[in-house]
Amino acid sequence: PGVTGPVAVADAFATTWSRGAAFDLRRGMAMMVFELRQVRRPTGVSGQPRWARPEEVDLLADWVDAFNVEVHQTPRPSLEQVRERVLERIHSQNVLVWEDEGRPVSLASRSRPSPRGTAINCVRTPPAYRRRGYASACVAELSQRTLDDGKLFCTLFTDLANPTSNHIYGEIGFESRGEFVELHFD
């Protein structure tokens, strides 16, 4: 159990919740929440975007599972649970793949739609394909498609300890809106 939210709110909740309790409070990931209202697409990135296909579910589920490991997802869903979620998102056109030379090289998905916005999440480029701009191009394209669908904005959470991703998302047009924190009750 735990809480995730804006730093001041999460800290206040944790302090109140833990009064007289027999558990330790552990800080998890420090995050930045970003908002995008206008996309700046990267240039010079090889490949093209497309919606993920059902026959790719096993490959993409492996990528999402690896993403969950990298971000220390707690609790971590089973690979079968990941596969089911990925397939649901594929069928609802919520997983975008960046493809280069006929093969998927990056993915980004979207979730938590509201009347005005949608969250971009689970951005993953396998290590062999990193540092080529694929993730930036994929996120920019998915964000633009989301805006084209009538949403006013996209949101995205990043790990504050990863300056590379924070910089990349800023280049695409995401603007920081505040720090969030995960707090765990052990």
Roles of regions detected by a PLM:
Residues 1, 15-16, 137-153, 175:
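Conserved acyl-CoA
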Residues 1-46, 183:
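Acyl-donor-binding surface of acyltransferase catalytic domains
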Residues 4-10, 156-166, 183-186:
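Conserved beta-strand-loop-alpha-helix junction that forms the acyl-donor binding cleft
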Residues 6, 60, 120:
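Residue-level signal for inorganic ion chemistry
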Residues 39-76:
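Short amphipathic alpha-helix that is part of the acyltransferase structural core
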Residues 74-124:
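A conserved beta-strand-loop-helix scaffold within acyl/acetyltransferase catalytic domains
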Residues 107, 177-179:
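Residue-level detector of high-confidence beta-strand sites
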Residues 121-127, 131-148, 166-171:
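Conserved acetyl-CoA-binding loop-helix of GNAT-fold acetyltransferases
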